[in-house]
Regions:
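Membrane-water interface at transmembrane helix exits
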Residues: 22-26, 54-58, 88-93, 134, ...
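Membrane-helix interface/capping segments
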Residues: 52-70
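Hydrophobic alpha-helical membrane-insertion segments
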Residues: 74-92
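Hydrophobic cores of alpha-helical transmembrane segments in multi-pass inner/ER membrane proteins
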Residues: 45-50, 127-137
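Transmembrane alpha-helical insertion/packing segments
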Residues: 1-57
Length: 148
């Protein structure tokens, strides 16, 4: 669990840094930097974090990593990232206000709580879904082949 905490929180710190820097440099929340750019950056960060977590698990296991162990490590990392990133965005919306959500499609037509709930569910479920995909692929390549 220590590995998942370490790498999941590192991914979240990268996301926090991206959000803070990009909102300072590009204040318009409708800019493509906040949509497409953030999506690409966050997914690459998530992929790298999952890879490093699974690779660390393999090193700690003296090079003997099973597919199941790699998958569990990657999913635990994705869960830590999903929870901590959701908490960060909750604090950000409560402190900055709903203008942080201005770039979300349809957010201007919904009450703030509904737009925020949709964003949190998307972030949480999306992080777990992509974490499953990334962990599966990474574990497939890093796991020790089973002998018959």
């Amino acid at each position: 669990m220590r590995i998942a905490l370490k790498y999941g929180l590192l991914i979240t710190l990268g996301v926090i840094a991206w959000v803070v820097v990009m909102h300072l440099l590009v204040p318009d929340p409708r800019s493509p930097v906040h949509g497409l750019g953030a999506g690409i950056f966050i997914n690459l960060l998530h992929l790298a974090g999952d890879y490093l977590a699974i690779k660390t698990r393999k090193i700690e296991a003296a090079g003997e990593l099973s597919f199941k162990s790699g998958l569990k490590t990657g999913m635990a990392t994705a869960l830590v990232f999903a929870v901590s990133a959701s908490l960060f965005f909750l604090v950000a919306i409560l402190s900055v206000g709903p203008k942080l959500m201005a770039g979300e499609p349809g957010a201007e037509n919904l009450p703030v709580w509904q737009a925020a709930l949709g964003a949190f569910l998307g972030l949480f479920v999306g992080s777990l879904f992509f974490g499953l995909i990334y962990s599966t692929v990474i574990s497939f390549f890093l796991a020790k082949p089973q002998r018959s």
